[in-house]
């Protein structure tokens, strides 16, 4: 577990959730398949129960990193709705003509936080005067910085702080934000960079 008392906001980083209808969903559909970013697991599971009860429609869900899901959809995966933690992957599918512009909505926001394993603390000043090598003595876990939204945002934040070249060798990059959260919960990384909504679990 991670403790909410060990959460610090990471400067200059946020995300936008983008929702798109991948294919036209029939008005009388018996089921709807939702592909959603792993960071939304709890929220979507709660909404799924409400939607199924109110509409008598089965909701099938698949969770992974936004990049993984986008590639699966491109390869023909049967998604009706795609909820991405990164607008770039929604753009990717839109450019492939798999999501129509008028079927897309950008909404919601999130922020990045630093987390530590339960029972451990971290005192850090998040500005350009701080030497991250003095603060981060162990591994730093986040999503893949090339493809997973949380990792891309983490890289952007560290770059803005002027820390990236010193942070990069310490990184453990994961397939999605939940995997990063679990690394920290098990004490395998000194800190993690995740979304505030994940840290609150």
Model-derived features: positions:
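N-terminal secretory signal peptides that target proteins for export/translocation
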Residues: 1-6
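Residue-level detector of intrinsically disordered/flexible regions characterized by low predicted structural confidence
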Residues: 8-11, 26
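Bacterial N-terminal signal peptides
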Residues: 11-22
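Exported/periplasmic ABC-transporter solute-binding proteins
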Residues: 25-77, 84-87, 91-201
């Amino acid at each position: 577990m991670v403790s909410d008392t060990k959460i610090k906001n990471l400067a200059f980083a946020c995300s936008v959730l983008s929702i798109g209808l991948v294919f036209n969903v029939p008005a009388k559909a018996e089921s709807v398949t939702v592909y959603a970013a792993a960071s939304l697991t709890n929220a979507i599971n709660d909404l799924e129960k409400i939607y199924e009860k109110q509409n008598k429609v089965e909701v099938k869900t698949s969770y992974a990193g936004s990049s993984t899901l986008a590639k699966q959809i491109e390869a023909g995966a049967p998604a009706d709705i795609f909820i991405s933690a990164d607008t770039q992957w929604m753009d990717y599918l839109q450019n492939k003509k798999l999501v129509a512009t008028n079927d897309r909505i950008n909404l919601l926001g999130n922020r990045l936080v630093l987390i530590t394993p339960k029972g451990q603390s971290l005192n850090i000043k998040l500005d350009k005067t701080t030497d991250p090598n003095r603060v981060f003595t162990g591994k730093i876990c986040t999503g893949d910085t090339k493809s997973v939204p949380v990792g891309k945002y983490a890289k952007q934040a560290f770059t803005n702080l002027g820390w990236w070249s010193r942070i990069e060798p310490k990184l453990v990059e994961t397939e999605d934000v939940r995997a990063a959260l679990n690394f920290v919960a098990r004490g395998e990384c000194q800190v993690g960079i995740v979304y505030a909504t994940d840290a609150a679990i």
